[in-house]
């Protein structure tokens, strides 16, 4: 029994690389669903009702299983350097439009860009230049043990009156992560200005210790850049200072997973509320009152009528269950 999953994913990834905007996101979602299959893919009917697999993508899967390939993918390979496109998209700050612009200019790889940048400094913006500098590091996953070491380093430097938590896949218990995302908050009695001052001092301490190796964005409430433990691999770090009133929403949103978040937001809409990383608001034109102050994830789950789900169990919409 042949498992066509690797072939289907490879062909759809070619299509994904050749698209932008909502079409690209459609392929991304379909690929994620198919990759998550726990059984062999032997019949196209298995993917028909999967999240992200619409009629057009389903027909492409049928073609792949019937012919061993996808004519549209072959055409993209002929007209686009797909391998190069994917490599260029791996550079932080380089999106589909910029990647195609570079390809059209004859730059088909990271090596091409590095060779050209000295004579053409305007080829990339500052963010893209740092992405190029740390390209090899950026495409490597971060093992959980290393994530824990980063967590220890960050919390050790954090002022005692601030609270910090690493979110994303790490908080969900994943074996590895793509980067480090940390939310920082402060007591309700503390002013925003005082919290920002402490946040800046936190970043200054990280920089003085040698932990920070490069910065992308540095402000009173947000910092993005590259950090390193000792002589280890440079890693992407995002720090975000969040007001206490928004912290519960932020930690819920940034923990994920993407599928879980989508299902959670859809549920909220059925209850007459719109949810984002900042707050919960009544749907325009509805009759729901503004929610009370909800400071924790547990309070948000309870208010919208959902059973609380631990971060490690937030996989997809199957966990979004009424209490």
Q: Which residues are covered by each model-predicted region?
A:
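Double-stranded DNA-binding cores of transcription factors and transposases
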Residues: 1-36
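Accessory alpha-helical DNA-binding modules that contact the DNA backbone or grooves
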Residues: 23-180, 184-221, 234, 248, ...
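Preference for bulky hydrophobic residues occupying beta-strand positions
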Residues: 182-184, 225, 239
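Non-catalytic surface loops within mature trypsin-like serine protease
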Residues: 186-188, 229, 243
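Short acidic-hydrophobic surface loop/beta-edge motif
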Residues: 221-231
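Conserved, surface-exposed functional patches that form binding/active-site neighborhoods
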Residues: 231-270
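Acidic, low-complexity intrinsically disordered tails
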Residues: 307-323
């Amino acid at each position: 029994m042949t498992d066509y999953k690797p072939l289907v994913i490879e062909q759809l990834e070619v299509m994904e690389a050749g698209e932008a905007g909502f079409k690209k996101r459609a392929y991304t979602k379909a690929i994620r669903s198919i990759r998550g299959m726990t059984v062999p893919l032997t019949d196209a009917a298995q993917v028909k009702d999967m999240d992200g697999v619409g009629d057009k993508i389903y027909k492409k899967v049928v073609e792949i299983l019937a012919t061993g390939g996808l004519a549209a993918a072959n055409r993209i390979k002929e007209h686009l350097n797909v391998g190069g496109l994917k490599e260029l998209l791996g550079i932080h700050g380089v999106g589909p439009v910029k990647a195609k612009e570079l390809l059209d200019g004859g730059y088909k790889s990271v090596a091409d860009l590095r060779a050209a940048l000295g004579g053409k400094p305007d080829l990339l913006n500052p963010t893209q230049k740092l992405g190029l500098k740390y390209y090899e590091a950026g495409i490597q996953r971060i093992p959980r043990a290393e994530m824990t070491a980063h967590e220890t380093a960050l919390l050790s430097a954090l002022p005692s009156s601030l609270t910090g938590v690493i979110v994303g896949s790490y908080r969900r218990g994943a074996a590895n992560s793509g980067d480090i995302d940390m939310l920082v908050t402060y007591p309700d009695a503390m002013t925003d200005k005082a919290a920002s001052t402490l946040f800046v001092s936190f970043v200054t301490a990280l920089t003085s210790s040698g932990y920070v190796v490069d910065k992308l964005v540095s402000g009173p409430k947000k910092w993005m850049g590259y950090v390193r433990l000792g002589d280890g691999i440079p890693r992407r770090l995002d720090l975000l200072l969040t007001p206490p009133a928004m912290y519960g929403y932020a930690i819920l949103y940034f923990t994920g997973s993407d599928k879980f978040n989508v299902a959670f937001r859809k549920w909220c809409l059925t209850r007459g509320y719109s949810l984002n990383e900042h707050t919960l608001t009544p749907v325009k034109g509805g009759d729901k009152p503004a929610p009370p102050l909800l400071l924790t994830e547990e309070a948000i789950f309870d208010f919208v009528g959902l059973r609380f789900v631990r971060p490690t169990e937030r996989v997809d919409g199957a966990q979004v269950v009424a209490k």
